[in-house]
Amino acid sequence: MQEKLLLELMKACTPSAIKWLKEKKEEYEHFCSNKLLPSVTSQYKKLNVSTSMLFRNQGYEIDHLYVPLTLHHEHKLEKKIVRVDQYPSDIFDLSRKVLICDSAGMGKSTLLKMIYRYAIDDIAQIPFYIDLKSLIHNEKVESVEDHLLRTFPSFNETPSKGLFTQLLEHNKYLFLFDGADEVADKYKEEVFRSVNVFSDKAKSSSIVVATREEDLILSSFYDFRLFKIKNLTKDCAFALLRKYEFKDCVAENLIDEIENNANKTIEEFLKNPLLTTLLYTAYSYSRQVPLKKSLFYKQVYHALYENHDATKQGFNFSC
């Protein structure tokens, strides 16, 4: 990612503050070149590396494994369907505050990380990705602003600290808050309150919170537009499987077996990105399509156990 691209992004996202920034040209240039741009660049690269236990220490890049997911919102007379294969500006048509809520394994975190990339690649908005668990520091909940200043220590130096606060008030950024359901229960209310207070301050920015469904979370973000992730189609699931051709495990062989063994359990697996990936993991271990859930999870367990041992020195395993 080139600095020129980020500078263009900065310019595109700050039209409302151009006059104000002209008066602070020196500080603005200092902030862009020495503070914000390096931070965004670093996060852009870091978020693209998969941290999934399925690809332990393999360095697989998320944008190479990603199959476009589709968000949908339905409420009374409102309806919106958005395929996320570029920056999804349409999800903010109804509100600048969005809640992405779905079950485990539907790809919420991956989706947020891809939206981060698209925001930069499409020169749409300057993004910030925040794991909500990280707002808990030294057993206390900190404000989003304090978290950003702590996470990016260089922001604390003048003129960056004051300028950051001013830019937050004047400009349109994108804040992606991940894992609301993963926050420890005793901190949840305070963490969610911190996000809402911040959202009110960053009046021009777009806010996205991703979570599994919980009553407390839904009520805490009641004024956010709720989006869910559509199930994968069979074609999308097969496209995902084809991206997971590791070692000598050919995805087409698995796909052929799935097509030849109609089974409701397998069809259910294919609707969920994580279960689709685990299906490949199970198949890579046994070369058999698990037609029962018990067999499926047993094969996954053994495959991951072998994968763990394969990282140890002297282990020799051929898939």
Protein language model features and the residues they cover:
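Long, charge-rich low-complexity segments
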Residues: 316-319
